[in-house]
């Protein structure tokens, strides 16, 4: 029966929309709920395309009705998210063909259906051929340090005593009378909770800890995501307030300069970064203006490029180091503006700009750190964009010292390779360091202090500092302490313990080989991703896929596939059960549509069990 339905849907897709009647809200809900194949997802897009002919509001109304009826989220969450993202979906489905590359990619995002299309062949053009040079050896001079932190997600309206176990996607506000202080069984403490974003008290403690443990830091890299996760409530005003308040807090507390980047949550609607030339009332210019103004204290006139498209290149004073901050939202799969009839190879010409900056750095014999929000190898990265960046990184691997990202909320690393069919210590070409988060939704709050060679800017060690929420005195004030040193932890696995030796790409590849043969070492690494909060084990396919992800700074090789018809249950938000993290890795609307589909699958499973 499923096969016959899929064939019928495929035939329907070829009929076009010219004579298509307006689909009813019930029809749209039924199609979303029953989607279990790529063909059926295309049918959903086909119906949305037909609805979009009657205006954006027709799409908004149908999706909102479906969300509420299915119980995918509370009514206010359904209305808030879909009112913001629904018009973008309407515009997208109006402008793309179904089926097409763009529509199938959209299906992987909205309903976790369809296989990700293969990367389109496209060679990046470089001004000069790659010279015969390699990474410089450590200078042996006295090391220096800097700080890397990410995903602060400060909730300016966090309410002490409000419920930390609410019905919303994120808690610790008085959404209902039963959530108010004194009316609930899980009151939020003054310094945060795993089901909530960061209160101001935690943010202030965080910056003070950086000053305490890294008083001589030359600078800090902040890899983005300032606003809280209440995506159904955000607007330009609230996001602007959040960005300005957080960067002001950094400026007033930290003596070190902070070099920032744009996260997906810095936009309103969330994830929404239209490209240049898009004729639409929704524009990214306001957020580029806000962040460039916030960054100007530390990067001065270089903030002008940030004002244009959220990226900049900055030479750190009195050093040979250039920091290049990328806007990874331009190849982020939950940015619904990327799905065009003719999907761009280089949105806003950012990759062309990056090549020019790296060529200038190579010519001047500068060292470079590349930073951005989303790691290019994760499942959230569009494969084409990730491939283009990987080409650039491998061309300039002797100039780039390391790369830095956030977004996942978990402490990890990724490796780039010059030959993806021969992964070895000899072909490992670049290391990406992925920072843990301040927000405690995926583990204990944490930041990293990196020890570096002052000439080559190669990474000599990475030390993580954290404040476990499970400490009995945590709510009296976070107890910050050293959590782990990369060289102390992993150096002994591969025979590299010399403090002056660099943690090269070859070193990190050898660590992944040690993970394969030493399961205790791997399980300890897996636990450290959440700073010890998630005590589950990762074996079999989980372990294989985790190591595959580490070795895949280019996303097409990360071994991940869409999670089709996965279970979704609000009960998993209860205290102690919300371990998955990666809250940044989902569009609010996509999560709603997938919840509708998975809830229907759960009902079918329960019914089948009853019939047995």
Labelled PLM ranges:
Residues 188-190, 195-280, 284-287:
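Core catalytic region of metal-dependent phosphoesterases/phosphodiesterases
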Residues 20-140, 144-158, 162-211, 219, ...:
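Metal-dependent phosphoesterase/phosphodiesterase active-site architecture
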Residues 148-150, 190, 218-225, 257-264, ...:
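Active-site neighborhood of phospho(di)ester-bond hydrolases with catalytic His/Asp-centered motifs
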Residues 357, 362, 386-394:
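Active-site neighborhood of glycoside hydrolase catalytic domains
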Residues 238-247, 347-354, 384-389:
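Well-ordered, non-membrane alpha-helical segments in soluble/globular domains
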Residues 156, 228-231, 260-271, 332-334, ...:
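Active-site environment of divalent metal-dependent phosphoester hydrolases
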Residues 222-230, 358-378:
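Short acidic, glycine-rich surface-loop motifs adjacent to enzyme active sites
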Residues 1-20:
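Fungal secretory targeting signals
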């Amino acid at each position: 029966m499923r096969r016959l339905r899929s064939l019928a849907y495929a035939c329907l897709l070829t009929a076009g929309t010219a004579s298509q009647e307006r689909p009813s809200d019930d029809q749209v809900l039924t199609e979303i709920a029953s989607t279990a194949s790529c063909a059926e997802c295309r049918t959903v897009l086909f119906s949305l395309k037909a609805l979009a002919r009657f205006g954006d509001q027709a799409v908004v109304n149908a999706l909102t009705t479906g969300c509420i009826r299915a119980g995918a989220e509370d009514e206010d969450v359904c209305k808030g998210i879909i009112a913001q993202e629904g018009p973008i979906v309407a515009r997208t489905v109006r402008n793309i063909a179904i089926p097409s590359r763009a529509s199938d990619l959209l299906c992987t995002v909205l309903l976790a259906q369809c296989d990700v299309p293969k990367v389109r062949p496209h060679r990046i053009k470089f001004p000069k051929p790659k010279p015969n040079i390699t990474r410089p050896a450590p200078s042996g001079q006295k090391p220096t340090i800097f700080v890397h932190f990410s995903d602060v997600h400060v909730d300016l309206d966090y309410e002490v005593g409000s419920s930390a176990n609410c019905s919303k996607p994120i808690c610790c506000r008085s959404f209902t009378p039963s959530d108010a202080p004194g009316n609930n069984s899980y009151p939020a403490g003054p310094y945060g909770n795993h089901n909530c974003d960061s209160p101001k008290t935690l943010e202030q403690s965080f910056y003070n800890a950086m000053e305490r443990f890294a008083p001589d830091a030359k600078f800090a890299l902040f890899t983005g995501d300032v606003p809280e996760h209440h995506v159904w409530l955000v607007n330009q005003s609230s996001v602007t307030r959040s960005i300005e308040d957080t960067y002001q807090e950094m400026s007033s507390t930290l003596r070190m300069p902070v070099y920032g980047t744009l996260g997906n949550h810095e936009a309103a609607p969330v994830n929404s970064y239209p490209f240049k030339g898009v004729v639409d009332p929704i524009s990214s210019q306001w957020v580029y203006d806000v962040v460039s103004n916030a960054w100007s204290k530390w990067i001065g006139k270089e903030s002008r490029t940030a004002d244009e498209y959220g990226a900049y290149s900055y030479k750190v004073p009195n050093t040979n180091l250039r920091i290049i901050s990328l806007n990874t939202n331009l190849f982020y799969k939950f940015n619904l503006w990327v799905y065009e009839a003719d999907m761009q190879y280089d949105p806003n010409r950012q990759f062309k700009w990056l090549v020019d900056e790296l060529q200038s750095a190579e010519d001047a014999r500068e060292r470079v750190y590349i930073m951005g929000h989303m790691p290019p190898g994760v499942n959230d990265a569009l494969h084409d964009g990730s491939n283009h960046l990987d080409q650039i990184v491998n061309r300039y691997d002797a100039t780039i010292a390391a790369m830095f990202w956030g977004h996942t909320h978990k402490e990890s690393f990724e490796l780039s390779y010059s030959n993806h069919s021969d992964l070895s210590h000899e072909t490992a070409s670049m290391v990406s360091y992925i920072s843990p988060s301040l927000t405690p939704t995926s583990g204990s709050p944490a930041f990293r202090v990196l020890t570096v060679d002052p000439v080559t800017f190669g990474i000599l060690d990475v030390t993580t500092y954290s404040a476990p929420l499970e400490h009995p005195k945590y709510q009296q004030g976070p107890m910050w302490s050293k959590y782990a040193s990369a060289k102390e932890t992993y150096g002994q696995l591969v025979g590299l313990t010399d403090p002056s030796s660099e943690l090269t790409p070859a070193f990190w590849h050898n660590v992944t080989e040690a993970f394969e043969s030493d399961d205790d070492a791997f399980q300890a690494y897996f636990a450290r991703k959440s700073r010890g909060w998630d005590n589950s084990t990762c074996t079999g396919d989980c372990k294989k896929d985790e190591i595959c992800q580490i070795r895949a700074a280019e996303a097409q090789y990360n071994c991940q596939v869409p999670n089709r018809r996965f279970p979704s249950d609000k009960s998993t938000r209860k205290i102690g059960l919300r371990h998955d993290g990666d809250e940044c890795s989902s569009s609010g609307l996509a999560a709603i549509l997938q919840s509708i589909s998975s809830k229907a699958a759960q009902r079918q499973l329960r019914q089948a069990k009853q019939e047995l």
